[in-house]
Amino acid sequence: MKTLTRKLSRTAITLVLVILAFIAIFRAWVYYTESPWTRDARFSADVVAIAPDVAGLITHVNVHDNQLVKKDQVLFTIDQPRYQKALAEAEADVAYYQVLAQEKRQEAGRRNRLGVQAMSREEIDQANNVLQTVLHQLAKAQATRDLAKLDPERTVIRAPADGWVTNLNVYAGEFITRGSTAVALVKKNSFYVQAYMEETKLEGVRPGYRAEITPLGSNRVLKGTVDSVAAGVTNASSTSDAKGMATIDSNLEWVRLAQRVPVRIRLDEQQGNLWPAGTTATVVITGKQDRDASQDSFFRKLAHRLREFG
């Protein structure tokens, strides 16, 4: 009898331990898979592609790659004498047409005063037409001069904001064309996190919810707030044919990959360029308030650690 009782006790204890282990694993797995978090997150920032509005030879490059610059600081300079001479030529054209317009105005006025008694109507109309033509040429020359005044200023390329110069690929002596990107400027204090959340986890993501950001390769946890959730993503399985009809790709019903939706997260504190734009991180949405790590259960701590390893 004692032997039977002992066997039943061992069996019951083993069964209870198995059930508890199953429950623990199940809860950890559910929390790991269904809670709003993602490893597919990246630091981002506002980036300005700087391109000159004039073409010419680069005479001076005043910065080096990855340098922190201030707003309006000179980045590089394009050959100025060419545009200064073009401005002088435009001003000379304006002066010429001003003198010519004055002469034609006097001539037309004289003929209008004399009238048809001294000359034909055709000669009077011709003088007025010539005056109007010269006035139009003067207006065109003035517009050209005003535009030429802008070009010497545009030969000096300045930083539009405080930030870091990156991917600098221009050097003194090179010829640069108008509109070609010369350098990128990563704006200071503009960093944020772009987290790509699976659609199955969006129920726990709302603007204003708090977030934890763990950069890859770091144990430091940054704090942030959900700023916005994207209103739509591209439907990769749907296209349009030549007649505008929808074309839907076939898929296997038992294999459904969740779409990832961009979620923008505003950082509580800017970290400078400690984590450059494009680097990855793990993001956990904690809800309306920050998570109190000291009150987490064993399962939550385990799941949180699992996230860091993927």
Swiss-Prot record:
**Annotated localization:** Cell inner membrane
Protein family per UniProt:
Belongs to the membrane fusion protein (MFP) (TC 8.A.1) family.
- The identity of this protein, by name, is p-hydroxybenzoic acid efflux pump subunit AaeA
Q: How does it sit in the membrane?
A: Single-pass membrane protein
Q: Which residues form a coiled coil?
A: none
Taken from the UniProt entry, a GO cellular component term is:
plasma membrane
Give the keywords, sorted.
Answer: Cell inner membrane, Cell membrane, Membrane, Transmembrane, Transmembrane helix, Transport
Under the GO molecular function aspect, what terms does this record hold?
A: transmembrane transporter activity
